Amino acid sequence: MRHSLPYRMLRKRPMKLSTTVILMVSAVLFSVLLVVHLIYFSQISDMTRDGLANKALAVARTLADSPEIRQGLQKKPQESGIQAIAEAVRKRNDLLFIVVTDMHSLRYSHPEAQRIGQPFKGDDILKALNGEENVAINRGFLAQALRVFTPIYDENHKQIGVVAIGLELSRVTQQINDSRWSIIWSVLFGMLVGLIGTCILVNVLKKILFGLEPYEISTLFEQRQAMLQSIKEGVVAVDDRGEVTLINDAAQELLNYRKSQDDEKLSTLSHSWSQVVDVSEVLRDGTPRRDEEITIKDRLLLINTVPVRSNGVIIGAISTFRDKTEVRKLMQRLDGLVNYADALRERSHEFMNKLHVILGLLHLKSYKQLEDYILKTANNYQEEIGSLLGKIKSPVIAGFLISKINRATDLGHTLILNSESQLPDSGSEDQVATLITTLGNLIENALEALGPEPGGEISVTLHYRHGWLHCEVNDDGPGIAPDKIDHIFDKGVSTKGSERGVGLALVKQQVENLGGSIAVESEPGIFTQFFVQIPWDGERSNR
């Protein structure tokens, strides 16, 4: 069916870049050259006519200054000898006529000798008879002509006659037409040069644009924009100077940046971005930076930065990042639930074993031993599990602590929840996730500090009061060296060797993001104690 054809097949394809550029440049060149031709042709007509008139005037002035002409005017026309001189000059300069008259307009020379002695035809001689040079177009006996007139003076500067020279008008027109054709050929040559230059320009543009047509570039741009705006990861691109050139919607949301804000410009973003993400090494050495955890405006972002190369030259860098905070919180909450389930599973196996013991004692009818065993089991449960569940109202935190108690037991150590501990459930997932992160790091650090030698003890105290949770984690391990304790929360600082020192920095960051605080005390060889204080919505959750 026709309507099922792809849209691209139904859409009319635009003209190619070469065709578009050639047509546009040709139209511009033709318009410009046409205007130049019209203006120049108008000027060249006047210039040609004026040039011929000036040439004729020069000849006329030369004759007017000739002594032979002056002397000849003192005689009768047939006896003056002026005819021979005038004809020689006329033929030499290819003129239509040279007529010398006296002050009565009687001819002393003419191409047709029989007209000598007759009056000059035309009133355009009158100005010359009054002492003024004159240029006019008029028809005489010979043809329509461009005629110039100049007065003749004697030695006393008294006018004694006039020299009239005629140029055939068809000759003037022919010279103008010759000039016009030279202009036309110049215009055509200019068009040809312009088209050749346009073809060269098109080839250069095609190379710059990788052989793509404009509509293909616009399609690629639209596809790129749609792709950038559809992905959830933030994307920020910079040029070789570190200036931000591209930012997608996800990045704007993660960075709380909006292009529409008048007070926010890409240059401002470039400055703040360079302070957060150091792209100088990537731009300089081309070394990618992968899986960096960076906090931007209370968000924990996982950033990857890679160089952008063109012909082997680094021309910029692209950073992609995503919000790791939400993922981490969900993983921590899930981890707490998994720990809770593992703890229940372990306890179910343990109680199954106890039931088998009880069943065996019943078969043996050892009722006294059975009574003692049941009482002991109940007391142990109350001390270990029942007491913990009574103090810790959050199932996630309770399951998490039970799993850590079992882990400490498996490692040969003891994890104790202080008897004065009291923790209501919180209505904030952020607070629960932060507490799990904090307790998890501090307890694991304590277990590692205690080492493989059994017998170590870890104490956890959780105390809630007036919207604040106070947490203490104490161990009797080797402690922290004095030269490291002041920097223990710095990223990369660890008592456990290289490639460590991230956990406590993350704990401090998340605690402070909630508005809380964390501190440490340690006596080498005796104890280490961490103090944590975070807001806790315990009262809201119990309403």
Swiss-Prot record:
<keyword id="KW-0812">Transmembrane</keyword>
<dbReference type="Pfam" id="PF14689">
    <property type="entry name" value="SPOB_a"/>
</dbReference>
<dbReference type="InterPro" id="IPR033463">
    <property type="entry name" value="sCache_3"/>
</dbReference>
<feature type="topological domain" description="Cytoplasmic">
    <location>
        <begin position="1"/>
        <end position="20"/>
    </location>
</feature>
<keyword id="KW-0997">Cell inner membrane</keyword>
<dbReference type="Pfam" id="PF02518">
    <property type="entry name" value="HATPase_c"/>
</dbReference>
<dbReference type="InterPro" id="IPR000014">
    <property type="entry name" value="PAS"/>
</dbReference>
<dbReference type="InterPro" id="IPR036890">
    <property type="entry name" value="HATPase_C_sf"/>
</dbReference>
<feature type="domain" description="PAS">
    <location>
        <begin position="212"/>
        <end position="323"/>
    </location>
</feature>
<keyword id="KW-0067">ATP-binding</keyword>
<protein>
    <recommendedName>
        <fullName>Sensor histidine kinase DcuS</fullName>
        <ecNumber>2.7.13.3</ecNumber>
    </recommendedName>
</protein>
<dbReference type="InterPro" id="IPR005467">
    <property type="entry name" value="His_kinase_dom"/>
</dbReference>
<keyword id="KW-0597">Phosphoprotein</keyword>
<comment type="subunit">
    <text>Homodimer.</text>
</comment>
<dbReference type="InterPro" id="IPR029151">
    <property type="entry name" value="Sensor-like_sf"/>
</dbReference>
<feature type="topological domain" description="Periplasmic">
    <location>
        <begin position="42"/>
        <end position="181"/>
    </location>
</feature>
<dbReference type="InterPro" id="IPR039506">
    <property type="entry name" value="SPOB_a"/>
</dbReference>
<dbReference type="InterPro" id="IPR035965">
    <property type="entry name" value="PAS-like_dom_sf"/>
</dbReference>
<feature type="binding site">
    <location>
        <position position="147"/>
    </location>
    <ligand>
        <name>(R)-malate</name>
    </ligand>
</feature>
<keyword id="KW-0808">Transferase</keyword>
<keyword id="KW-0547">Nucleotide-binding</keyword>
<dbReference type="Pfam" id="PF17203">
    <property type="entry name" value="sCache_3_2"/>
</dbReference>
<feature type="transmembrane region" description="Helical">
    <location>
        <begin position="182"/>
        <end position="202"/>
    </location>
</feature>
<keyword id="KW-0902">Two-component regulatory system</keyword>
<dbReference type="GO" id="GO:0005886">
    <property type="term" value="C:plasma membrane"/>
</dbReference>
<feature type="binding site">
    <location>
        <position position="121"/>
    </location>
    <ligand>
        <name>(R)-malate</name>
    </ligand>
</feature>
<dbReference type="Pfam" id="PF00989">
    <property type="entry name" value="PAS"/>
</dbReference>
<feature type="topological domain" description="Cytoplasmic">
    <location>
        <begin position="203"/>
        <end position="543"/>
    </location>
</feature>
<keyword id="KW-0418">Kinase</keyword>
<feature type="binding site">
    <location>
        <begin position="140"/>
        <end position="142"/>
    </location>
    <ligand>
        <name>(R)-malate</name>
    </ligand>
</feature>
<feature type="modified residue" description="Phosphohistidine; by autocatalysis">
    <location>
        <position position="349"/>
    </location>
</feature>
<dbReference type="InterPro" id="IPR013767">
    <property type="entry name" value="PAS_fold"/>
</dbReference>
<dbReference type="GO" id="GO:0006355">
    <property type="term" value="P:regulation of DNA-templated transcription"/>
</dbReference>
<feature type="domain" description="Histidine kinase">
    <location>
        <begin position="346"/>
        <end position="538"/>
    </location>
</feature>
<dbReference type="GO" id="GO:0005524">
    <property type="term" value="F:ATP binding"/>
</dbReference>
<keyword id="KW-1003">Cell membrane</keyword>
<comment type="function">
    <text>Member of the two-component regulatory system DcuR/DcuS. Involved in the C4-dicarboxylate-stimulated regulation of the genes encoding the anaerobic fumarate respiratory system (frdABCD; nuoAN; dcuB; sdhCDAB; etc.). Weakly regulates the aerobic C4-dicarboxylate transporter dctA. Activates DcuR by phosphorylation.</text>
</comment>
<dbReference type="InterPro" id="IPR004358">
    <property type="entry name" value="Sig_transdc_His_kin-like_C"/>
</dbReference>
<dbReference type="GO" id="GO:0000155">
    <property type="term" value="F:phosphorelay sensor kinase activity"/>
</dbReference>
<feature type="binding site">
    <location>
        <begin position="107"/>
        <end position="110"/>
    </location>
    <ligand>
        <name>(R)-malate</name>
    </ligand>
</feature>
<dbReference type="InterPro" id="IPR016120">
    <property type="entry name" value="Sig_transdc_His_kin_SpoOB"/>
</dbReference>
<keyword id="KW-1133">Transmembrane helix</keyword>
